Amino acid sequence: MRIRPILALMTAASLIFAACGGTTSQAPSTAPSQAASSEPSSAPSTAPSTAPEAATVRLQLQWVPQAQFAGYFAAQAEGYYADENLTVELLDGGPTIIPQQVGSAPDGPEFTISWVPKVLEARETGGSDLVDIAQMFARSGTLSVMWADSGLTGPCDLAGKKVGVWDFGNEFEVTAGLGKCGYSPGLENNGDPTSQYQKVIQAFDMVAFLNRDIDAAEAMIYNEYAQVLEATNPTTGNLYQPEDLTVINWNSQRVAMLQDAIFARASWLAEGNNRDVAVRFVRASIRGWIYCRDNPGECVNTVLAAGTALGAGHQTWQMNEINALIWPNQYGIGILDPVFWQQTVRVSKGAGIITTNPPSAAYDQSIVQEATAGLADQNLKGDGFVKGTVTPTPGGE
């Protein structure tokens, strides 16, 4: 794949992103003032003036090494964690690893990457004390894709159809979106084809969709959607094109929910100087994401060196899409959007993921605020960010 520059000096359209506050409401209330340079920096250089106390920590990733986590790999490779006197072990995820469960264990990793609704569910039903300390993704990357020649045009066309989803909490946006149409799963149990659909647990790939075994497939814009575009259309002999597909972007359906965030256990944060360790970890990680925004090609190489299973072309696509989920953010990277938080809670309650509003203890913006205060000379908002254009390659090679 080829990627064009993704940062230009132009005025970015304003997006509504605000910070956290409040006590027991379902949303933070005010947005802190964040200083941000309008000029990008190719290598964020801010580091502590004196060496802080050394610490060794672990970060549980949601999946295997890929550009979804490029900022953390970059923070390690570029020495940003070392600048904070941190030794960081990046723990691979996978189909059998549930990060919010691993991270909730008393002896679990100090930091965890997970989606907000999964953690809210774990807090309510599993006694987790995970806290969102840095909301890295400002937008959801979840799609559902259908074949354009099927005549299906949107979620309310899926009654009586086979709808692929992933489990372990990855399905929440899809099932919530279909719920807005008045549809529920259960068609496979002699259900009503006018108000129910067959919920098919999809493998973490697009094989069933490409074989037309399901009518709609869940896909991340940075991963499985690209896998379809990297596959050969047997009719034409060429790669599938976007016009071959009908795409439901759950952001536009107002059921998207907050995704990748850095979580830490409240009990761990309360011990010793662990909160300071968290500030340093978040600061170094943000430097890694700034580096990947400004140097996407270098970050792709870093991810490939980490042992990713998919090729350079696929990781280039993914890096481009991941950057677009993070940047721009009106109030700065890592700051929680109160409107999106409210939507996440509303959709989670409506879908039965949680039954009550989460307490204010579910998030703590003070850590990311302190971390970014030490990066005031950086372009924390991504002002001028422009998403690049990437051309899919066969098999993502």
Where are these regions (language model features)?
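Short, surface-exposed acidic
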Residues: P185-Y197, G237-L245, R275-D276, G307-N323, ...
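Bacterial lipoprotein signal-peptidase II cleavage site
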Residues: F17, G21-T30
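Secondary-structure end/capping motifs
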Residues: G272-T355
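Pocket-lining segment of extracytoplasmic ligand-binding domains
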Residues: P117, S150, F204-A208, R212-T308
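Sec-dependent bacterial lipoprotein signal peptides
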Residues: M1-A18
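Short, glycine-/small- and polar/acidic-enriched structural segments
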Residues: A51-A203, N211, D215-Y222, P242, ...
